[in-house]
């Protein structure tokens, strides 16, 4: 994280200061003119001041004769656009730095993961014993509830829950054993 902050600060210091003469990419007047009579639609970009951002100053050469210029210009939509490419570049560098750091962290975790998840034989044996005890208690509970006195709705629901829990426990044990045999 400190490296990322350092890269961002150095990037901001190395970027040249904003100039009064911005390039045509940073400041522009964009006019979108739709089709008019036999003339197809067109987009015009021009580096002009904000007060001159209209069809008469931006659309060059004028595609219509003199008497249709006013009607053509009324159809055109002109917008003044200003952006800072320096800011955009800095944001992209920061974004790529964060993504790169996350990718490095992911690669580190993938390398370290086998060492962290190394199974301990003693812990695995205790886990198996706990599962066997749980399965035995579930089986005895299911046998006692599943008897002839399960007359009420509540007792039937509890019996169904116990049977379901027993089935889930058996399935877990089977899946765990299969997984153990495969690896």
UniProtKB/Swiss-Prot annotation:
Extracellular side: 21-89
Domain of life: Eukaryota
GO cellular component: intercellular bridge; late endosome; lysosomal membrane; lysosome; mitotic spindle; multivesicular body membrane
Residues that span the membrane, as ranges: 90-110
Tissue expression from the record: Expressed in heart, lung, kidney, liver and intestines. Enriched in the hepatocytes around the central vein.
Keywords from the named record: Endosome, Glycoprotein, Lysosome, Membrane, Phosphoprotein, Protein transport, Signal, Transmembrane, Transmembrane helix, Transport
Phosphoserine PTM sites in chain numbering: 144
Residue positions the entry lists as glycosylated: 21, 38, 47
Biological processes, Gene Ontology terms: endosomal lumen acidification; lysosomal lumen acidification; positive regulation of canonical Wnt signaling pathway; protein transport; proton-transporting V-type ATPase complex assembly; regulation of protein catabolic process
Membrane topology summary: Single-pass type I membrane protein
Entry comment on modification after translation: N-glycosylated.
Principal subcellular localisation of the protein: membrane
Disruption phenotype: Knockout mice are viable and exhibit no discernible phenotypes in the overall liver architecture and hepatocytes. However, they display impaired hepatic regeneration with reduced Wnt signaling. Knockout mice also show a suppression of intestinal tumorigenesis.
Location of the protein in the cell: Lysosome membrane; Late endosome membrane; Endosome, Multivesicular body membrane
Signal peptide: 1-20
Similarity-based family: Belongs to the TMEM9 family.
Domain notes: The transmembrane domain (TMD) is essential for the interaction with ATP6AP2.
Role: Transmembrane protein that binds to and facilitates the assembly of lysosomal proton-transporting V-type ATPase (v-ATPase), resulting in enhanced lysosomal acidification and trafficking. By bringing the v-ATPase accessory protein ATP6AP2 and the v-ATPase subunit ATP6V0D1 together, allows v-ATPase complex formation and activation. TMEM9-controlled vesicular acidification induces hyperactivation of Wnt/beta-catenin signaling, involved in development, tissue homeostasis and tissue regeneration, through lysosomal degradation of adenomatous polyposis coli/APC.
Name recorded for this polypeptide: Proton-transporting V-type ATPase complex assembly regulator TMEM9
Gene assigned in the entry: Tmem9
């Amino acid at each position: 994280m400190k490296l990322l902050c350092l890269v961002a600060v150095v990037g901001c210091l190395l970027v040249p200061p904003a100039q009064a003469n911005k390039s045509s990419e940073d400041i522009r007047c964009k006019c979108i003119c739709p089709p008019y009579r036999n003339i197809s639609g067109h987009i015009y970009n021009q580096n002009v001041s904000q007060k001159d951002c209209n069809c008469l100053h931006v659309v060059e050469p004028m595609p219509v004769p003199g008497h249709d210029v006013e009607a053509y210009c009324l159809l055109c939509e002109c917008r003044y656009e200003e952006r800072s490419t320096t800011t955009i570049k800095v944001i992209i560098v920061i974004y790529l730095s964060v993504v790169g750091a996350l990718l490095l962290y992911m690669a580190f975790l993938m390398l370290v993961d086998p060492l962290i998840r190394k199974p301990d034989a003693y812990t695995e044996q205790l886990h198996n014993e706990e599962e066997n005890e749980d399965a035995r208690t579930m089986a005895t509970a299911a046998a006692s509830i599943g008897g002839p006195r399960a007359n009420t709705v509540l007792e039937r629901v509890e019996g169904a829950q116990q049977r379901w829990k027993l089935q889930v426990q058996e399935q877990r044990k089977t899946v765990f054993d299969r997984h153990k045999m495969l690896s």
